[in-house]
A protein has these predicted regions:
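Active-site-proximal helices and loops of the catalytic beta/alpha 8
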Residues: 246-255, 264, 269-280, 334, ...
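Substrate-binding/active-site clefts of carbohydrate-active enzymes
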Residues: 142-208, 215-341, 362, 368, ...
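Short conserved micro-motifs at the rims of enzyme active sites and ligand-binding pockets
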Residues: 150-153, 387-388, 416-418, 458-461
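Active-site-proximal substrate-binding groove within the catalytic cores of carbohydrate-active enzymes
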Residues: 431-467
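Glycan-association/targeting regions that enable binding to alpha-glucans and other polysaccharides
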Residues: 1-135, 139, 369
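Hydrophobic faces of well-ordered beta-strands that scaffold small-molecule active sites
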Residues: 137-139, 210-212, 256-258, 346, ...
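Short, flexible loop/turn elements at secondary-structure junctions
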Residues: 31-33, 46, 60, 74-76, ...
Length: 467
């Protein structure tokens, strides 16, 4: 017996890909050879619910194949629908599901209930993403390493606790050179004036979006240890310089996206204030601190949840109403404030470590500040079916993200160019993303070949086999 269903061909599944709530999907199965089944059924289920079986009547022949077909109405509530096929034959039950790589397209026959089902993403009809982002070319800037805009090349900020690098020096840092601890306190002196200075160059490159790594006040060079969400790091400039950057960039058709680090702050911050360097009363200093509920202490003050065990990055308690008001919903909340100051969107750091309710509230408030602002998430896998911390993520159902960083494309591209996969698998990987992502999200993907979190592409391809 030969069985075929190809989720990428409209003959077998129509319409292709993700669909809106309440829409209808036609599914077909082709069967040929000995042992024509006495019954063919579609088995489908909404995410987290039980299986539903629906008979698939024979409708016509195509060559030697008998075609079975059924129409299924998708749920009114956004979510994922999974399906496979079961056939009753004279030799027993036969099943047909997604392939073992779970990439969609042509599936596989088996004699036990398949572990891999096909996916249909069902999203809200009002899901819209900014048009300006869909056709843009983005350029990522790690501010300290980009350009020093001061004519004399001096460092801003007057800090005395840093290691100053020469601009042409190799950014190589051995922890043992500095007491055995990596403090991320070596700086090259890049600043926002430097970004402004390079805007004509970026425009000539065809850039229409600049994604800035974190720029708020923090101890480290990378600034993922936020010290103060309200203040541009003095080594980079100030609020007026940021406004000038956004204004001049817009004049050149370039928009600025900020890195939003809302899963954790720095231990050296106005909110935690472990070292007493801020004039606030931090959560580490007193249980009466206005920020005490922002963090998760197991044994105050020294034992607390932190990002991946890094005690310099105490984890935020997103259930704290006061924290969410400050970051998200107050009139001058952080996500609104910087949009009003000229930013055109946010890239959310480690978004899979933010609970869904937090991301939904963030989207609601960002879109209030600017309905055309973009919200991009850091997700490393297929973002349509991602599960994290026991929660199925709902990034693309219409209430959370506009899109994500396209790490799956990067991996597929590197594997293909390196000769690790053939062109058929390369195509299958990319088509799987197109099949699973709603069109508004798919056409807003931040397609990358490198980022600050992975090896630079020139380094990565150094081990590519010669062709």
């Amino acid at each position: 017996m030969d069985i075929e269903h190809n989720s990428r061909k409209k003959f077998y599944r129509f319409p292709f890909g993700a669909v809106t709530c309440g829409g209808e999907v036609r599914l077909r199965l082709a069967v040929s050879g000995a042992g024509i089944p006495s019954a063919v059924r579609l088995v489908y289920m909404e995410d987290g619910k039980g299986e539903v079986r629906k008979d698939m009547p024979y409708i016509f022949d195509v060559g030697d194949h008998c075609i079975y077909s059924v129409n299924v109405k998708m749920p009114e509530k956004a979510g994922l629908v999974w399906y496979y096929f079961e056939l009753e034959t004279e030799r027993g039950m036969v099943y047909y599901g997604n392939n073992s790589k779970q990439l969609g397209g042509i599936g596989e026959m088996c004699f036990n209930s398949p572990s891999n089902s096909y996916q249909i993403t069902v999203y809200n009809e009002d899901y819209k993403t900014p048009d300006w982002f869909k056709t843009g070319i983005a350029y990522q800037i790690f501010v300290d390493r980009f350009c020093n805009g001061n004519e004399n090349g001096e460092f801003l900020g007057n800090r005395t606790d840093i290691i100053k690098r020469n601009w042409g020096e190799q950014p190589f840092y051995k922890a043992e050179q500095f007491g055995g601890e990596y403090k991320a306190n070596d700086f090259f002196g890049g600043n926002l004036k430097g970004v402004i200075k390079k805007l004509p160059y970026l425009k000539d490159l065809g850039i229409s979006v600049i994604y800035l790594n974190p720029i708020f006040k923090a101890y480290s060079n990378h600034k993922y240890d936020t010290g103060d969400y309200e203040t541009i790091d003095p080594m980079f400039g100030d609020e007026e310089t940021f406004k000038e950057l956004c204004s001049k960039a817009k004049e050149m058709g370039i928009r600025i996206i900020l890195d939003g680090v809302f899963n954790h702050t720095g231990s050296n911050s106005r909110y935690f204030n472990k070292y007493g360097e801020y004039d606030s009363v931090g959560a580490y200093q007193s249980k009466e601190s206005p920020y005490y509920t922002w963090f998760r202490f197991m044994d105050w003050p020294d034992v607390y949840e932190s990002w991946w065990g890094m005690t310099t990055l105490p984890q935020i308690e997103e259930h704290s109403e006061e924290c969410r008001k400050y970051l998200l919903s107050d009139k001058d909340a952080i996500v609104k404030r910087w949009i009003k100051n000229g930013a055109s969107g946010w890239r959310l750091d480690v978004v899979d470590e933010l609970p869904g309710f937090f991301v939904k509230e963030l989207r609601e408030n960002v879109k209030k500040a600017d309905k055309d602002a973009v919200i991009i998430g850091e997700v490393w896998e297929d973002a349509s079916n991602k599960s994290a911390y026991g929660e199925r993520r709902e990034y693309f159902l219409g209430k959370e993200l506009d899109s994500v960083m396209n790490y799956p494309m990067r991996r597929a591209l590197i594997d293909a160019v390196s000769g690790r996969i053939d062109v058929e698998e390369f195509d299958a990987r990319l088509m799987s993303i197109k099949e699973n992502y709603p069109a508004p999200a798919y056409y807003s993907l931040l397609n990358i070949i490198t980022s600050h979190d992975v090896e630079r592409i020139m380094t990565r391809m150094g081990d590519a086999p010669s062709r």
